[in-house]
Amino acid sequence: MGFSMFFSPENDVSHHSSPYASVDCTLSLGTPSTRLCNEDDERRFSSHTSDTIGWDFLNGSKKGGGGGGHNLLARRCANCDTTSTPLWRNGPRGPKSLCNACGIRFKKEERRASTARNSTSGGGSTAAGVPTLDHQASANYYYNNNNQYASSSPWHHQHNTQRVPYYSPANNEYSYVDDVRVVDHDVTTDPFLSWRLNVADRTGLVHDFTM
């Protein structure tokens, strides 16, 4: 009885159960079901991470390529095939298809062609803006001025020329000269005829004016 006070059954149970009541061995050991769940979660996380990285990489390449052109293919001039130029200019193959030098030349040729088309459609001006004379008009102007000068000049008249005989005292023979007569006045203008009409025919010479 004396020892029962110190060693009661309740104290004995609590003394023996306290070191083992707080320990759960099942939680520390992984069962097959818990191991499968953990492996599935790891697979899903890894696959999601790889998909995210791949999508971000593709989006990054698209954003970078949209601003400065395709990174793998360098831009080339459509005319001289150069890849380095301070400025890309518009050309016949589209925007930014020519280098700076070729673009300037192309622009000059385009302006020159448009100026030539405008001058051709207008018909009265050249590329420099200077009016050109019509060939037919200039020819008519030249012809009319010459005719006006000919009609006003006393040396230009319409003549009728015919062969007439005249006597040469030096050779004692008759020769033929051109008898030039003005149509309007019917006056002989040949200086030889002024004295030819006053020469008397010699009896020793026979001539026929009807021939």
From Swiss-Prot:
It comes from the Eukaryota. GO terms for biological process: flower development. Induction: Repressed by HAN. GO terms for molecular function: DNA-binding transcription factor activity; transcription cis-regulatory region binding; zinc ion binding. A zinc finger (GATA-type) spans 77-102. Residues 111-131 are annotated as: Disordered. Pfam families: GATA. GO terms for cellular component: nucleus. Disruption phenotype: Effects on sepal fusion, petal number, fertility defects, and carpel abnormality. Keywords: DNA-binding, Metal-binding, Nucleus, Transcription, Transcription regulation, Zinc, Zinc-finger. Gene3D superfamilies: Erythroid Transcription Factor GATA-1, subunit A. InterPro entries: Znf_GATA, Znf_NHR/GATA. The keyword Metal-binding applies. It is found in: Nucleus. Transcriptional regulator that specifically binds 5'-GATA-3' or 5'-GAT-3' motifs within gene promoters. Regulates both flower and shoot apical meristem (SAM) development, especially for establishing organ boundaries in shoots and flowers, probably by controlling the number and position of WUS-expressing cells. Belongs to the type IV zinc-finger family. Class B subfamily. Forms heterodimers with GATA18. This is GATA transcription factor 19. It comes from Arabidopsis thaliana (Mouse-ear cress). The lineage of its organism: Eukaryota, Viridiplantae, Streptophyta, Embryophyta, Tracheophyta. The gene is GATA19.
